[in-house]
Structures are given as C-alpha cells and as structure tokens.
Amino acid sequence: MGKRVQLVLNEDVRKLGYSGDLVEVAPGYARNYLIPKGIAYRATPGVLKQIEHRKAEELKRLEGIKDEAAKQKVALQTIGTFRIEQKAGEEDMLFGRVTSPDVAELIANISGFEIDKRGIDIPDIRKLGTYSVDIKLHPEVIATVKVEVVPE
C-alpha cells in the first residue's frame, strides 16, 4: 500500500468519518476530491494540537455532565418514593395506565429535575401499588426510584 495523507474532515463523509475526525486517505483522493471541495484540510502539527485541545475540553465537558447526572441520581434516590394519584375501579385496576410522561412530570414537579421521558424504563402499570422505575440520566448513570400508585 502506498503513502497515506492525514486530513481533518470539515463535514461527515460516509464510510470515512465524521466532522472533526482525523483520517488517513490516499493522496489522490485528498488532492483531487476532499481538499478542493472543502470537505477536508491537511492535518499540520498546529492543527493536531488544536484537535487534542478540543478533545480534552470536550472530555472535561462530558465528565461535568456525568457528574451532574450522578448528583441527580443521589437526589432522586434520597427522595425515595414518588406518589402518583390515579382513578381506579374494581380490584384496584386503573382507568388507563401510568406512562413515562406521567412519571417525568411527577419527578419534575417534586424534585425540579427535567427528565427526558424517553430515558424512563417503566413497567406496564395498570394497577394500584408500588413499582420500581429505572431512569436513564446519562448513558452511564441509571437511577432506580419507586413509584407508588394510589387512588384519587
């Protein structure tokens, strides 16, 4: 295989990489297509330092987000049980069911944390009782809380 050229992508290129990625390509592909179209630029030592600096800042930012999620997890688990009132009929069956938007709204009202309803893993709640609900606050941080469904 011949010599390869290091480039930094300005935009996403299918089967090659995403914007900001450092990639190695054939010199002809770089010279004839990627660079003239403005899709990529040469990776000089100064550019490589900038990329490393940006990655370090991004890593720091992501760690901050993860730490914030861990604090939210502790706060949610300190609250303990979240109580939600629903209309119920015979044999403690609910009229309807408790859904993830209901739980997200309940948590927001009680704790003040805005939780994405798509991050809530909720069992099928159609009866009164206490249920365990997993809340994905971050890809690496999952909080488990109790939701108690009581009659109105």
From Swiss-Prot:
Which residue pairs form cystines in this protein? none
- Give an example GO cellular component term for this record: ribosome
The record's annotation in InterPro entries points to: Ribosomal_bL9, Ribosomal_bL9/RNase_H1_N, Ribosomal_bL9_bac/chp, Ribosomal_bL9_C, Ribosomal_bL9_C_sf, Ribosomal_bL9_N, Ribosomal_bL9_N_sf
Give the GO molecular function terms.
rRNA binding; structural constituent of ribosome
Segments crossing the lipid bilayer: none
Q: Which HAMAP family match?
A: Ribosomal_bL9 (MF_00503)
Protein name per UniProt: Large ribosomal subunit protein bL9
